């Protein structure tokens, strides 16, 4: 009789423990409640580097004469840059000669056989000086320098190189904004905000401060650096 009671007690304890483990197993596998939020941070910055390719060309049937005119134009461009405080800013000088008679695919009907083009690349941290000079290129045209259009790449490109210096502050601000949004959601839903489950800083963008149709951010000296952080927070309660 006592052996039967002992066996029944052991069996009952086994059922109780089994139920405890099963219940807690389901609880551990219950889906975690999370909220996904985004935090935005922006900072207005000023370009700290200007890169400006100045391309000009001459054409004719006498190669030596064409090259002489290009040398004259090169002197005019260098003098113009020196006048605007950019005499030491020429980082590169390239020359290209095109002989139309040597182009098998070209038409034999042409006025000038030779085209000689030169490019002076200006690279300067004096952004204001470059901007002022770029607005005065009519002086070069008045001196007979034929500046060549480069389509959407015309004019200087204004760059901001200090992204890495401000990146930590931007990320901190973006995460703070995201946490504030998550805390508000937790409050409104009657929950408590838990730890970060997942985080994605996203891309850091450099945008024109004043957006305009067809305008590139490289054409504007004033820019906006933006970062968007996406975070998943656990919810408690």
What are these regions (language model features)?
Residues 2-237:
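Short, charged, surface-exposed interaction patches
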